[in-house]
């Protein structure tokens, strides 16, 4: 047990005293090496260190800039640069021995100098010494660190060249001399080395030159200098599989990777011949004999390259004789703490074979795949300078994008296949080695095969947390600004202005028909400094994105998009919200702007240019802002780009504009009873007033639609009261003063105010209320109105619930066109009691080029849920739901306790079942027109919560949709007891159609039910027919039919007649011509929804 103050060594776990800075056993430093410092050294400029003061000077300096020391260069040898903190080794040059009367070691190999005999006249015992490689460094350590003051030493861990006086490495802290226990060479495992991405690869050292091959013997008078050669070593690509540079990087290995079975250590008496080095003429006979043996090997063609340094454990290893690989016969020399690996033919790489990148087996060049693991040759042998000529998907031998069988362009981020191509083989998840089917453990890292089976059967985790609204906005803006800065930098470098090629300035972006007057008036697209200002007083005002924006700044153009401008005016009551929409908030000289909008429930940052449609005189034709502000025109152009054209922005409701601009949940409160469906529930004016009061206290945005929708409007009567029909107003304040319910409204136009009761000029104002409600007098376009008049002349109130401190999560899905498709359900996990808002958006509902652009009957259902074994979903009690409506989006809100919930999104008026037999009759304006789209329509479920929640899209059972509809109808529908043991449930009012569910509680009798809805109009049936006959088994219930409103703008009518009888058999007998139990038959397209379900 460690005492107080002792510290454990991170390398050998030895307990050292508190005052000890290095480990007493392995001399490792107490603190871990600074990785940042090592990385900085790896990219340091090429410099040479001063031998006197250790200052690092640039290569061009002949003397030290600090102390003035001038190194003595070797004649004819250039000063070696230090690259990446490592002193590179010059080419090894072999020189034939001169003189026969002196005892010499023959040709020897050094790392920085050609070793020759001493110069004549020099005292015996002196010799020229230079910095040499690992062999000399090893020898210096064994001889008591005998090094000259200016030589220095190379760190054996990180190869940094250190000063002679340093006792430990200045980069990694490694000791100069190691004192670790010896480990036999058999315990060392050398893995395959791959160069790390992003690091510079030092070119490989030159190959040795044999005597007689370009290196001639020097005369005695010139033997003092280094010998030069004219032969150029063979060039190997830096990142080639055969590059020795990539294969000679030191790779540290942990101790746990040493195999458990070790052979007896080699006796220290056996010395490696490769570790011999020249020490001059004072070498003994033993070294001379070793040198002679070395020379014989070189002359016989068995030359050795400078050993590559693969230090796998920082421990001293006893020297042993060189061994050879059993597979390729390459020389593997274990000496000291160094493992030298020498290929059999390093100077001439073998291009007749290629190494498999998966299992490292060498295959013949003619083989396209590995004979063992089936790995592709392209991944194991390919020059990096040549682009790939094979398609990764179809294998076509064509350069560039594939236009053959697959027709796909190569992806920049291709997923790596970790699973083997051949059946039975398995890839280790730890080291990716391909193993044989019989192997229970990985041959490299001993990972069990059971782990692979578990990983293969696991499904990817799709559960995610909700994100804070403000954090999401900041994240989106950060990503968008990075793109914007690149575009602006490119435009500045090339002196051009940005032009958006995805929404070009042309007729297609305007989008109106060819003969339309609006299309003909667009003559040119101009930038702000080229546009003529229509207001004379604004001529001297410079252009800007914002200039103290006001709602009255908005001016509508030729487009019929007042729904969007009304929402923009409501948003302008809070200038900070408008600034959040504009990501680029200042004028851009290059003309690139970004706008953040929420289209169909999904946040999108839109990039646009500042080229705006103008007439021949240079005046703007579409929406604009006064005082030369660009925010209105840029937001409108971004919205037009999202939906395809300016033409697509025509017609809409202000609530859609609020949802697009804010991304917040929006709710519309109807003030009038629907004229298309008089049987709708009556309007509760007290409930609406309470909601408006609470919304004002919460700081929500509110807008009101005047004289539109379901109302019959007399334009003259409205204008006489100062109102503008089919126009949106902003609700500024809601007050309950002395029993009077008052609202303060603003006309975005800044003119035309209400002149009825409680108006500015109304003579019956109480004095104290006038001073309280209008302290600054009247202003143009702003007025007070009594709530009863508001109900009479306005159609609806739109509430935008902007929460700056809420969480949000958005889940994409699709509406299946039949019950046979997958039923998407969103699993919701509530961690603490929270208030939640749900909004369901239909994707692509505004685009005019969509194949199936009609609106769907959207509905949201929220249930308690339980997940059984295997994640099987079971629905519980219905907690909340939206009304089923043919709109662009619907919403609902609920307060939930901690637990598991399921959110079901459904729509039915796009179903196109094809029952067998003759075509079924459809009572709808578009009968006979195929409505089925190639792909099911998509949707986005937006979840807003006051606390953190978890959402996860899950795939439910095919019968989950039937269970959800049955629970909804039983909970909210009308109950009718037709006979004993039979109950019918109807859901019609406020549900954009009809849902009929029948329950048979008889234990033995069948229930035959016939439902006739042939007199209905503008509805479509999920059964493909308006007349159905079904046999409900005992103790079962069934969804007989779902009728859905087809066209949202047109009225619909539903008439249904129900006939039922008890029967002892399941067949319908005389009700159908065939012996069937359902008519139309329950095909797989509808069985999941309309099949009988047990009670």
From Swiss-Prot:
Gene3D superfamilies on file: Cysteine proteinases (3.90.70.10), Zinc finger, RanBP2-type (4.10.1060.10), Zn-finger domain of Sec23/24 (2.30.30.380)
ZnF RanBP2-type span: 3-32, 44-73, 148-178, 348-379, 422-451
GO process annotations (BP): proteolysis
First and last residue of the signal peptide: none
Keywords per UniProt: Hydrolase, Metal-binding, Phosphoprotein, Protease, Repeat, Thiol protease, Zinc, Zinc-finger
Source domain of life: Eukaryota
EC primary class: hydrolase
Disruption phenotype: Knockout animals show significantly reduced viability. Homozygous knockout mice also weigh significantly less than their wild-type or heterozygous littermates. These mice also display severe developmental eye defects, including anophthalmia, microphthalmia, and cataract, and the presence of these phenotypes is significantly increased compared to wild-type or heterozygous mice.
Region Disordered, residue ranges: 96-153, 204-292, 1074-1095
This enzyme's EC code(s): 3.4.22.-
Molecular function as annotated in GO: calcium-dependent cysteine-type endopeptidase activity; zinc ion binding
The keyword Zinc appears for this protein: yes
In-chain residues carrying the UniProt-annotated modification Phosphoserine: 311, 345, 348, 1079
Tissue-specific expression: Highly expressed in the brain and eye during development. Expressed in olfactory bulbs (at protein level).
Entry annotation: catalytic residues: 562, 727, 747
Domain Calpain catalytic: 497-803
Entry keyword annotation includes Hydrolase: yes
Biased composition (Low complexity): 280-292
Segments of skewed composition (Acidic residues): 125-140
InterPro entries (alphabetical): Calpain_cysteine_protease (IPR022684), Papain-like_cys_pep_sf (IPR038765), Pept_cys_AS (IPR000169), Peptidase_C2_calpain_cat (IPR001300), Znf_RanBP2 (IPR001876), Znf_RanBP2_sf (IPR036443)
Protein family: Belongs to the peptidase C2 family.
The protein, known as: Calpain-15
Organism of derivation: Mus musculus (Mouse)
Name of the coding gene: Capn15
